[in-house]
């Protein structure tokens, strides 16, 4: 069985690395961020009256 030359291994590694990086970059940029609606009920401030 013939063995692969070191340059072929390097070429194979570079191709897989480039494919992996492109996959990660596309997954990062393809998602559209969803807008979070601010509701005033979540931002209510609790006030405590202290009786000393």
From Swiss-Prot:
Keyword match Ion transport: yes
Gene Ontology BP, a term: proton motive force-driven ATP synthesis
Subcellular localization: Mitochondrion membrane
Membrane topology recorded in Swiss-Prot or TrEMBL: Single-pass membrane protein
InterPro entries cross-referenced by the UniProt entry: ATP8_metazoa (IPR001421)
Keywords: ATP synthesis, CF(0), Hydrogen ion transport, Ion transport, Membrane, Mitochondrion, Transmembrane, Transmembrane helix, Transport
Chain coiled-coil ranges: none
Statement: the UniProt record of this protein carries the keyword Transmembrane: yes
Transmembrane segments: 6-26
Family named by the database record: Belongs to the ATPase protein 8 family.
Protein's name according to its UniProt entry: ATP synthase protein 8
Organism: Penaeus monodon (Giant tiger prawn)
């Amino acid at each position: 069985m013939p063995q692969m030359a070191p340059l072929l291994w390097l070429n194979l590694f570079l191709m897989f690395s480039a494919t992996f990086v492109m996959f990660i970059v596309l997954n990062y940029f393809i998602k559209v961020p969803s807008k979070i609606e601010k509701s005033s009920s979540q931002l209510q401030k609790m006030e405590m009256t202290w009786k000393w």
